């Protein structure tokens, strides 16, 4: 079983989604998990304990294990991510330029089959970009911050 498959099976078995996995040259293994309700420190601890056990049993070599949430600027990698975050503001970087641009920022539309839509501000007003997962180099949510006090 490959490392990604092993980790994903473990993470999903605990009720979380594996968002991303990074392995650095210094033996650091970074795992990013999520779930619809969000991630708390206890969730990271739970996954860390289970992964430490699994990685030891499977004799996977690593120096340090880090489990965390993907953050406010969460990467979008799977079609399900684009569906879940439809209506959110995102930044998309394409592998190849389209109309002289690779980077777009706009409102994500729900996928229609394999096609994903992005409404963005073009040179002549609102425009629509249609693309597939294969066209994307990177896609991330744009963080939303609300600094207004809850008191009125």
Curated annotation (Swiss-Prot):
In the record, biological process GO terms are: ribosomal small subunit assembly; translation
Report any Pfam family annotated for this entry: RimP_N
Q: Where in the cell is it found?
A: Cytoplasm
- Its primary localisation, in coarse terms, equals cytoplasm
Q: Check the record and name the InterPro entries matching this protein.
A: Ribosome_maturation_RimP (IPR003728), RimP_C (IPR028998), RimP_C_sf (IPR036847), RimP_N (IPR028989), RimP_N_sf (IPR035956)
Query: One Gene Ontology cellular component annotation?
Result: cytosol
What keywords were assigned to this record?
Cytoplasm, Ribosome biogenesis
- Organism superkingdom: Bacteria
Q: Which family does it belong to?
A: Belongs to the RimP family.
Q: What does this protein do?
A: Required for maturation of 30S ribosomal subunits.
UniProt name for this protein: Ribosome maturation factor RimP
From the UniProt record, report the name of the gene that encodes this protein: rimP
């Amino acid at each position: 079983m490959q490392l990604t498959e092993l980790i994903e099976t473990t993470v999903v078995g605990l009720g979380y989604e594996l968002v991303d996995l990074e392995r650095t040259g210094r033996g650091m293994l970074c795992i990013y998990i999520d779930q619809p309700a969000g991630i708390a420190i206890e969730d990271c601890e739970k996954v860390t304990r289970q992964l430490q056990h699994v990685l030891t049993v499977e004799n996977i070599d690593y120096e340090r294990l880090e489990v965390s949430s993907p953050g406010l600027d969460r990467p979008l990698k799977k079609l399900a991510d684009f569906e879940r975050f439809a209506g959110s503001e995102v930044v998309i970087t394409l592998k190849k330029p389209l109309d002289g641009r690779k980077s777009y920022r706009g409102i994500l539309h729900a996928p229609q089959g394999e096609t994903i839509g992005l409404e963005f501000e073009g040179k002549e007003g609102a425009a629509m970009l249609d693309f597939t997962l294969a066209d994307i180099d990177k896609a991330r949510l744009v963080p939303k911050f609300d600094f207004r006090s809850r008191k009125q």
